[in-house]
Amino acid sequence: NFIILNKIIDVNRTLYIPEILKFSYLPELIIIEIYDDPSTKITNKKSTIFVEFNNNNYEYILDSICLRDIKKQHVGCFITLNKDDYFFDGDSKHRIKLEPWNSETLLNKSKIITFTRESAKFNLMSGYQILYYFRNN
């Protein structure tokens, strides 16, 4: 079971992600969708978020992000594999590379990620993105 946070809290309107979320049930997965324009203004993306349920706090860990490139033509993914951070771009010749991304500093920093000068350019502070958080406890 999962929950799409935007159905409950419009992060694209409020321009922030709450510190602690409260739901009527405990999902395995929380999905946060951030649109193009708000992506430049939401500066509190977290690698860990918490849900309060039945007077207990549950931890959710950011596992992956699907991100559209800055020209709005292509999608790449930041993924976690064996506890390491990678960037995947199926359109690139090399396709996957080790790329540390899962920290508050990097999640909220304007930094171009690309494989080569000719390939698509991605930026976590500029583009449509979907964040996937899995329950850790």
Question: Where would I find each of the regions flagged by the language model?
Answer:
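UBL (ubiquitin/ubiquitin-like) substrate-recognition surfaces
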Residues: 1-137
